[in-house]
Swiss-Prot record:
Its main location: nucleus. The gene is BAS1. Disulfide bonds: none annotated. This is Myb-like DNA-binding protein BAS1. It holds the Pfam family Myb_DNA-binding.
Length: 811
């Protein structure tokens, strides 16, 4: 009980401090602050309610006694990850709490296992040792330090123990104080940003030093240099006398005292030192009705040392004429987009009137003695690839606004950055009302200045003495000059006859060739040689869309677009017409059976043919080029013959009951059957043998996937083939015509194709030659036995079942 009473006594003692909100003072001085205005304070009732909710959640998660079973900070961290904080946040009816707020309040303040307060020497040593072991993995580090969370460990190391904060405890010099004040002017109270530019000064140290400076200035204890630096950029007139240490009320900060009252305050302080309730910070008359003047370097700061009343919109004068080309604007004399800013006499005046100015925009340094009159001449002839005479203009075009208007707009935002209201500022009364509302409800005001300059393009254009063109900057409707892109001129212009160096335009012949090139490239069979993708050792007459003539380019010169094309596509200049065997060339010359070099394996790179050998009309050069670019190891898999042979061999070596079709060599059989089936169109193939008569249902299962015209290609199924191979005297299946029994029977070999030249694998067969020989020998044996059996059946009229056979598979 004594401990609890001691804590209560400590809490009951008044806190020693300045008695005023330093952030409010900073804001009143005109500095930008980044306060979390939407933060909700936690009362004792809210804390007790959160404790009970967490205790109930712990019991639901398996802790029988609730929080009493949570002994370590690691267990607390595990518990906090399992609790549904969004559900707990909905239990707070009177205040708006998010799941993040509830979780942060528990883990950062109310957790009984959380250790708060100063770090001991032992904890610092443990932190340094854990950092050497784990690095910046703060969760692992917190596991080695009991009672400290990962956030506490990270903050302690970065702010105090890290190498970047070794000099944080050294004395602040006057130079550092002034540097800190300038950083706060530039960035506001973004302490991490400020500390990144301060040597060995962590963010926490910078914040504490700023608070001390403000406190000393308010109390009159700061030096004249610091006080002047603080007040230099602001519109608040602080008292010269020493300020007392009495707590400053909000009404005192927002006091509307007059200069006469300020003098009375100074006299009263001298005459009556015990006066305690007087204004400490005095604002000049009509503070809220004064419009802040924007400076060049400070950006949109709402205060100035010399306040200026808001002028009526009608009295705002238009900015002076600007005789320069700004970034992104269009030059009226030549329709040339320029990024060159001309030095003018009134540039400083223009920057004063425009917020921010364009001083930081990229500029191009001009040569000495360069006047604005030669801007167009400089732009037309600098970095040019031509030696054409320079264009001189008789007059200088200036850009003067026809009309200008200025608008002041405001946006009122709450603490969370959400827009509440916005509109146009048209009176000082509205400004005063905005300031009062912002102070009353802790709102933010954003002021925007909009200057609208309306320019009129001049109708008269200077005429060039050489070309007589009214618009020298426009070439074929394109506002971009070739001079503005010298690298493009080097790529397209060197050695190309279409680019005329005198006029920097495309002649009609070259323009026609470009149009043809586009149409060829987008056609069904594009002509890739228009882009010089292939070597040019062939006759130039074969390619009508080639850029330029052969006299202007060497044969082995690198391509404009693909310089490495010659190394990828070597020229096959020794090809002749006789090298293409028409018997082996199918409709698609990309087939692996296409022998381009007298039976040798076709090359994967040599793709060009001579002028006399024409490709089949349905094969476009794009398909040939695509095939020739493939590696040699992939090319054999693209042909239909190799894929079919590989699939048939796989089915033959690994049969399955579901495979009911036979894919033998069908090319010759189809030709023979067509000659026979032409006489019997209505006949259907019925498969018979001496062991079993297959009924109509079995025939329907062995038909092909296509319609009846393709049924003559189908043979027996796998089980019939297996039975015929297992018998001592097997009879091969015979196809007979249903209408004409006297027709010549035709033997069908299941799954075994005759080894002919058309179906051979050629040079790509590889390891399949051995299997093909075995299959061919078996096919010849079955063929001879089939002839003997057919002759025996015709003479004897039938035979008995004497051989041992496999039972019929009912499936």
């Amino acid at each position: 009980m004594s401990n609890i009473s001691t804590k209560d006594i400590r809490k009951s003692k008044p806190k020693r401090g300045s008695g005023f909100d330093l952030l409010e003072v900073t804001e009143s001085l005109g500095y930008q602050t980044h306060r979390k205005n939407g933060r909700n304070s936690w009362s004792k009732d809210d804390d007790n309610m959160l404790r009970s909710l967490v205790n109930e959640s712990a019991k639901e998660l398996g802790y029988e006694n609730g929080l009493e079973d949570v002994k370590t900070i690691q267990q607390s961290n595990h518990l906090s990850k399992c609790i549904a904080w969004d559900v707990l946040a909905t239990r707070f009816k009177h205040t708006v709490r998010t799941s993040k707020d509830v979780r942060k309040r528990w883990t950062g303040s109310l957790d009984p296992n959380l250790k708060k307060g100063k770090w001991t020497q032992e904890e610092d040593e443990q932190l340094l040792k854990a950092y050497e072991e784990h690095g910046p993995h703060w969760l692992s580090i917190s596991m080695d330090i009991p009672g400290r969370t990962e956030d506490q460990c990270a903050k302690r190391y970065i702010e105090v123990l890290g190498p970047g904060s070794k000099g944080r405890l050294r004395e602040w010099t006057l130079e550092e104080d002034l540097n800190l004040i300038s950083k706060v002017k530039a960035y506001g109270t973004k302490w991490r940003k400020i500390s990144s530019e301060m040597e060995f000064r962590p963010s926490l140290t910078c914040r504490n030093r700023w608070r001390k400076i403000i406190t000393m200035v308010v109390r009159g204890q700061a030096s004249e240099v610091i006080t002047k630096a603080i007040k230099e950029n602001k519109n608040i007139d602080m008292t010269d006398g020493k300020l007392r240490q009495h707590p400053i009320a909000d009404s005192d900060i927002r006091s509307d005292s007059t200069p006469n009252k300020e003098e009375q305050l100074q006299l009263s302080q001298q005459n009556n030192p015990s006066l305690i309730k007087q204004d400490i910070l005095n604002v000049k008359e009509n503070e809220s009705s004064k419009l802040p003047r924007l400076k060049d370097n400070d950006g949109p700061i709402l205060n100035d040392s010399k306040p200026q009343a808001l002028p009526p919109l009608k009295e705002i004068s238009a900015p002076p004429p600007i005789r320069m080309t700004q970034v992104g604007q269009t030059h009226t004399s030549g329709s040339i987009r320029s990024k060159v800013s001309l030095p003018i006499e009134g540039l400083s005046q223009m920057n004063k009137q425009s917020p921010g100015g364009i001083s930081d925009s990229p500029q191009t340094s001009l040569p000495p003695a360069f006047n604005p009159a030669s801007l167009d001449e400089h732009m037309m002839n600098s970095n040019s690839i031509s030696d054409s005479p320079k264009h001189a203009y008789s007059t200088v075009k200036t850009r003067e606004p026809n009309s200008s208007s200025t608008q002041w707009k405001f946006t009122l935002k709450d603490g969370q950055g959400l827009s509440i209201s916005n509109g146009t500022i048209d009176s000082t009364k509205l400004v005063k009302e905005l300031v009062d509302q912002a102070k009353k409800y802790s709102l933010k005001i954003s002021i925007h200045q909009h200057i609208h300059n309306h320019y009129v393009t001049s109708t008269d254009h200077p005429v060039s003495s050489n070309t007589g063109l009214s618009n020298i900057g426009n070439i074929n409707g394109n506002p971009l000059l070739m001079d503005s892109f010298p690298h493009m001129g080097r790529q397209l212009g060197n050695g190309l006859p279409g680019l005329n160096s005198n006029s920097d335009t495309f002649n009609p012949e070259y323009r026609t060739s470009l149009d043809n090139m586009d149409s060829d490239f987008l056609s069904r069979t594009p002509n890739y040689n228009a882009f010089s993708l292939e070597a040019t050792s062939h006759n130039p007459a074969d390619n009508a869309n080639e850029l330029g003539s052969q006299s202007n380019r060497e044969t082995n010169s690198p391509s404009v677009f693909y310089p490495q094309a010659n190394t990828l596509i070597p020229t096959n200049s020794t090809a002749t017409n006789n090298e293409i065997i028409q018997g082996n060339v199918s409709a698609n010359s990309m087939s692996p059976n296409f022998n381009g070099t007298n039976g040798k394996a076709p090359s994967s790179t040599a793709s060009y043919t001579t002028s006399g050998s024409e490709m089949p009309p349905d094969v476009g050069p794009n398909r040939i080029a695509h095939f020739n670019y493939l590696p040699p190891t992939i090319r054999p898999h693209l042909g239909s013959s190799d894929a079919t042979r590989g699939a048939d061999l796989n089915k033959l070596l690994n049969p399955s009951p579901n495979s009911v079709r036979s894919n033998g060599s069908k090319t010759k059989k189809k030709e023979k059957r067509k000659s026979e089936s032409s006489q019997h169109h209505s006949s259907s193939s019925v498969t018979t043998n001496k062991f079993n008569h297959i009924d109509q249902s079995e025939i329907s299962r062995t038909t092909s996937r296509s319609d009846t015209p393709l049924r003559d290609e189908d043979g027996l199924d796998f089980w019939e083939t297996l039975r015929s191979l297992a018998t001592t005297n097997p009879n091969p299946p015979v196809e007979k015509s249903a209408e004409n029994d006297g027709a010549k029977p035709q033997v069908v070999h299941q799954g075994i194709g005759s080894h002919t030249e058309d179906s051979s694998l050629g040079s790509h067969s590889g390891g399949y030659d051995f299997f093909n020989e075995l299959l061919d020998k078996k096919a010849d044996t079955l063929h001879n036995e089939a002839k003997k059996t057919s002759e025996h059946d015709m003479t004897s009229g039938g035979s008995t079942d004497n051989g041992s056979v496999l039972p019929l598979n009912p499936s």
